[in-house]
Amino acid sequence: MNHILSDRINNLATSQTLAMAALARELKAQGKDIISLSLGEPDFNTPDFIKAAAKKAIDDNYSTYSPVDGYQDLKEAICRKFKRDNGLDYKPSQIVVSTGAKQSLYNIAQVMLNDGDEVILPAPYWVSYFEIVKLSGGVPVEVPTSVETDFKITPEQLEAAITPKTKMMWFSSPCNPSGSVYSREELTALAKVLEKHPNIYVVADEIYEHINFSGTFCSIGSIPGMLEKTITVNGVAKAFAMTGYRIGYIGAPEFIAKACTKIQGQVTSGANSVAQRATITAVDADPSVLNEMVQAFHGRRDLVVGLLKEIPGVKINVPEGAFYVFPDVSSFFGKTLKGHEIKDANDVSMYLLAEANVATVTGDAFGNPNCIRFSYATSNDILTEALRRIKEALTA
């Protein structure tokens, strides 16, 4: 019945992370002992002080529509957060609160892109960037990076990718899926390229900023001359273990913020009222409240990287943030493992599911055909068992 559906939906790829997670759940329901490392979701509970704020909001009868762009006091709190944590000076009129950072990104693409506008995507990138750009009429321009360069785009690569049709560059730091974190020096070098192209805007996805093991974090918008051409995207899902609250937000030039409010008013209107009230408490909190969770992720990172380095043929960078590893498995291409012909990263991912009962995600979904991604947002015991299975399968 695809001929009845729109070309738009027929040309839209299914989210590979969600698809693999669904397949893992299906196999588990069949009684298989599946370890799913496919989804990026903290395995911690929302902090009690945030849950208390949500309960209070219910008792205070926050049960009606909010303003389309979010409650004024929440936008003021987000401005304080941007100033405190990122050195970014925004006014409440430059803030738009949405139903998750994914909607924030979709709003941006819809209001910024005309048909044929090019968007530079340093690869690997988060799975939805590519499809969101396509859905909005834009043309994704992938710039490949590799494990040898810590999966970071260089100024030379950025300059070479720019054409008269370039409208934007989208990137995340810390990066999903590679965990790479750009330093101030690296971002300054990219900014020097962009300052020669005043009509190119940057989307800086900083959803993982607090899950950062490097000791420092820099927002590209804090570099002189960049705030006016940067749209900073963030949210509370990852750092505060609030994935189900569905709150994301942007700080942007005011004309872009107004445009995002305009389109959101025709799609979802304001985000969940109770979740917004809880978010005020989250963004006003000192980041030190997250130390225990961040330290746990740091320890898991070290465990997983150490175990992966024991597997012959696997190459890996050391992720400095987020909660993913993105190993290069290209040395297995062209081999046959336990009767499975391995041609690409997707074959590796499916082989590990079939033979190791471990769900990962192919790097193709993130714009890198040589890698697979898995999340270490689970316990050390589960990670140790998963890596034991992976090692056994890949050394067969």
Predicted regions and their residues:
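PLP-dependent class I/II
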Residues: 3-5, 9, 13-15, 20-23, ...
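A glycine-/small-polar-enriched, mobile loop at the entrance of the PLP active site in fold-type I
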Residues: 38-41, 56-74
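Glycine-rich phosphate-binding segment of PLP-dependent enzymes
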Residues: 46-65, 84
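Conserved N-terminal alpha-helix of the aminotransferase class I/II PLP-enzyme fold
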Residues: 65-98
